[in-house]
Amino acid sequence: MVCIVSAYYKIPSKKPHEWYLPYLVRWFRAAASNTVPTHFFTTEDVRQELASLTDISRVQFHILPFEELTAAELGREFWELQYARDPERYHSPETGMVWYEKRHFVRRAIEMEPDINVFIWCDAGCIRNDACEEVAKKLGQRFVQYEAGRMYFQCIQEPAQKQFYQYPDECIAAGLFAGDRAAWKDFIALYEATLFEYTIAGFSATKEQNVMASCVFKKPNLFVLWTQEGKVDRTWFKFLELL
């Protein structure tokens, strides 16, 4: 069995909250037509706003204040440092915190779902058009031959063989990724260690795509890099129609 996990927080981000709302509505419309168990982490005000816009009844909500995220345990100064080192200035410290937290949202869902083996992270803002919305209705129902103990990443281009990645490197698309319980456990531990290696080396760890690429460099056998293109979305969100 498969589980979908996502989250959304109203924070300083690349785009204003109003820009994301239509895509959030699309996400929940697709979820309403899906049969895969789905967990969503957010705040109560966001839940109420979404409930006023679309049907959210099939999704299991978890109200988790932003200040209670695992990312907050690293301290505000840690995320301010990542932002200060980040050449892409539209990434706020809060954005870095949510990107980091994706793995811990999944960790929480894993703890809640002892009978489910495969977990898919799916960004709440990744459904941008009608075609993506349609294929997302079957997310988690197509691909069943997950290799035990391996994470599945969307590969934009084969990562160069190096320890650290920074702008303009683009190797891994982080809107959707998946794996079984064992793979997630190993990936979370590897990501944590790699995050601090970035910090010690003087690189920004804000952008999860870069840290994920470094994880692939360090432990390639943990990952399946999916290069196949989608028909609806060819790159960043192709797992919407492939998983």
Stretches found by the model and what they are:
Residues 1-23:
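N-proximal low-complexity "stem/linker" segments adjacent to membrane-targeting elements
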Residues 21-37, 52-56:
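Short, acidic, metal-binding catalytic loop of nucleotide-sugar glycosyltransferases
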Residues 44-51, 161:
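Short, charged/polar "capping" segments at the starts of alpha-helices
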Residues 55-113:
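Active-site-proximal specificity loops/subdomain of glycosyltransferases
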Residues 100-152:
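GT-A fold catalytic core of metal-dependent nucleotide-sugar glycosyltransferases
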Residues 128-131, 166-243:
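Catalytic core and acceptor-binding pocket of nucleotide-sugar-dependent glycosyltransferases
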